[in-house]
């Protein structure tokens, strides 16, 4: 059976077309040009007309170049030798270390059978009060971080990578600016977390289509480690770049566009990645946090809009803080009843008072007379934002709850906050003489 073809029928964008037989969808090929060789993946079959997506781009490729089909889909190596290593979007070493080619596994496999999943039950502590107290991250949860360009979403991921109580961090970068990539690397190395981290990074200087592999390669490795009993946290940034790469390929393939030019299968493509989040019975787990930037701060943009139907809530980053009103962890009730008996009460009461403080801020801005209660709310708002909402705050959950009580006692009387007497008697700070 012929597996090497020496004629390329057409080259359009990053897609080449050859006439070939016995080729499977998703099969990998090597395109050999005069000076280089590039990986390509079969993305369309029309009888013997085969379209391949070239991951390194088609610059330098001619119609006389050789295409060799490998007979298998994209693969990545899997072993503990990956710990502390940095790879590009195609799994090639980016850190100057040796190439790893043993124990290869296929990427892009199906999601775990729902019957094999267990109900989420464990909290992942991050040391960030706006997560731990108010929208708890739960093991095996899938959550996006909605943001706009310019917000410190990558800095937030760095904080989570450094502080999250997990066994392994897998960072998948898509279209990362070189400065952001270096910041991830240097921050994790300085913080001592690089040894438990695996990087798969497609930078803005790399071919755009290479970013399509990053989520699949990251999640394939995560699944294998989870099956070995490790608690894995996958951090992806930025899923909008991933969707834009899909859009670029769809336009090249002359697919009928859907909303704002994105392919019609955008939802299923995103879902197939997010649904990899799982907690295995008797083994480990995969938790996914994925940055999704919103062009123009538009939550109805196709990427965040579709994402919201797939995930179990979202963190909404605005003004350099995790916005409490736009953020939601739909699984927090699975775990915040197991932490401390005042957790849910503090969470509900503080957010309720913070919402009331927004009305007082508006009254002050419009020149209305301020009541004593308004002044208390204004003081509370300032303390809440500086001591709990600030992303630089790094304290354990129990200290964050104690701090919540301190803030309440600094601004209000016990009877003003609507909390049960037994909890007030147990946790209300005693004033020092």
Curated annotation (Swiss-Prot):
Q: Quote the InterPro entries the UniProt record gives.
A: ATP-synt_VA_C, ATPase_F1/V1/A1_a/bsu_N, ATPase_F1/V1/A1_a/bsu_nucl-bd, P-loop_NTPase, V-ATPase_su_B/beta
* Pfam families tied to this protein: ATP-synt_ab, ATP-synt_ab_N, ATP-synt_VA_C
Q: Establish whether keyword Nucleus is in the entry.
A: no
> What GO molecular function annotations does the UniProt record carry, in alphabetical order?
ATP binding; proton-transporting ATP synthase activity, rotational mechanism
Q: Which UniProt keywords apply?
A: ATP synthesis, Hydrogen ion transport, Ion transport, Transport
Q: Which GO terms describe its biological process?
A: proton motive force-driven plasma membrane ATP synthesis
Disulfide-bonded cysteine pairs: these are none
Query: Which CDD domains does this UniProt record tie to the protein?
Result: V_A-ATPase_B
NCBIfam families reported for this sequence:
PRK02118.1 (NF002555), PRK04196.1 (NF003235)
**Described purpose of this protein according to its UniProt entry:** Produces ATP from ADP in the presence of a proton gradient across the membrane. The V-type beta chain is a regulatory subunit.
- HAMAP family linked: ATP_synth_B_arch
Which PANTHER family does its entry note?
A: V-TYPE PROTON ATPASE SUBUNIT B
* Family recorded in the similarity comment: Belongs to the ATPase alpha/beta chains family.
Q: What is this protein called?
A: V-type ATP synthase beta chain
Q: Which organism is it from?
A: Borrelia hermsii (strain HS1 / DAH)
High-level lineage: Bacteria, Pseudomonadati, Spirochaetota, Spirochaetia, Spirochaetales
């Amino acid at each position: 059976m012929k597996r090497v073809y020496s004629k390329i029928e057409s080259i359009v964008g990053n897609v080449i077309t050859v006439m070939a037989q016995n080729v499977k969808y998703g099969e990998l090929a090597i395109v050999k040009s005069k000076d280089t060789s590039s990986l390509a993946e079969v993305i369309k079959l029309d009888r013997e007309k085969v379209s391949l997506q070239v991951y390194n781009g088609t610059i330098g490729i001619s119609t006389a170049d050789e295409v060799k089909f490998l007979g298998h889909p994209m693969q990545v190596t899997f072993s503990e030798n990956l710990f502390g290593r940095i790879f590009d979007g195609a799994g090639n070493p980016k850190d100057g270390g040796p190439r790893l080619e043993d124990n290869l596994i296929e990427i892009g496999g199906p999601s775990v059978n729902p019957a094999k999943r267990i109900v989420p039950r464990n909290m992942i502590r991050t040391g960030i009060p706006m997560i731990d107290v108010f929208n708890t991250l739960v093991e095996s949860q899938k959550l996006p971080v909605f943001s706009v360009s310019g917000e410190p979403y990558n800095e937030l991921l760095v904080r989570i990578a450094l502080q999250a109580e997990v066994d392994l961090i897998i960072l998948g970068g898509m279209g990362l600016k070189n400065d952001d990539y270096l910041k991830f690397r240097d921050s994790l190395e300085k913080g001592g977390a690089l040894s438990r981290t695996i990087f798969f990074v497609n930078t803005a200087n790399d071919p755009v289509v290479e970013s399509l592999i990053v989520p699949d390669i990251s999640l394939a490795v995560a699944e294998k480690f989870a099956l070995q009993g490790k608690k894995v946290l996958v951090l992806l940034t930025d899923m909008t770049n991933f969707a834009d790469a899909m859009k670029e390929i769809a336009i090249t393939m002359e697919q009928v566009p859907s909303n704002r030019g994105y392919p019609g299968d955008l939802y299923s493509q995103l879902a197939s990645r997010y649904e990899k989040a799982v907690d295995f019975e008797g083994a480990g787990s995969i938790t996914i946090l994925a940055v999704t930037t919103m062009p123009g701060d538009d939550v109805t943009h196709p990427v965040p809009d579709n994402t919201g139907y797939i995930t179990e809530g979202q963190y909404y980053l605005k003004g350099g803080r995790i916005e409490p009103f736009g953020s939601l962890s739909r699984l927090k009730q699975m775990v915040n009843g197991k932490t401390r008996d005042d957790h849910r009460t503090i969470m509900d009461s503080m957010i309720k008072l913070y919402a009331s403080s927004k009305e007082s801020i508006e009254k002050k801005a419009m020149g209305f007379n301020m009541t004593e209660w308004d002044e208390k709310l204004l003081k509370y708002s300032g303390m809440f934002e500086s001591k709990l909402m600030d992303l630089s705050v790094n304290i354990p959950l129990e200290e964050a709850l104690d701090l919540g009580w301190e803030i309440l006692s600094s601004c209000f009387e016990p009877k003003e906050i609507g909390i049960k007497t037994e909890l007030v008697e147990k946790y209300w700070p005693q004033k020092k003489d």
